[in-house]
Amino acid sequence: MDYLITFYHSPQTNS
């Protein structure tokens, strides 16, 4: 589940 880590470390959709 690397996507979760990447997503968590990449708050691009953190409106």
UniProtKB/Swiss-Prot annotation:
Reactions the enzyme catalyzes: RX + glutathione = an S-substituted glutathione + a halide anion + H(+)
Keyword terms, alphabetized: Cytoplasm, Transferase
Top EC class of this enzyme: transferase
Single GO term (MF): glutathione transferase activity
Source organism superkingdom: Bacteria
GO cellular component assignments: cytoplasm
Localization per record: Cytoplasm
EC nos: 2.5.1.18
Subunit relationships: Monomer and homodimer.
Family affiliation: Belongs to the GST superfamily.
Role of this protein: Conjugation of reduced glutathione to a wide number of exogenous and endogenous hydrophobic electrophiles.
Name this polypeptide is given: Glutathione S-transferase
Origin species: Pseudomonas sp. (strain M1)
Lineage: Bacteria, Pseudomonadati, Pseudomonadota, Gammaproteobacteria, Pseudomonadales
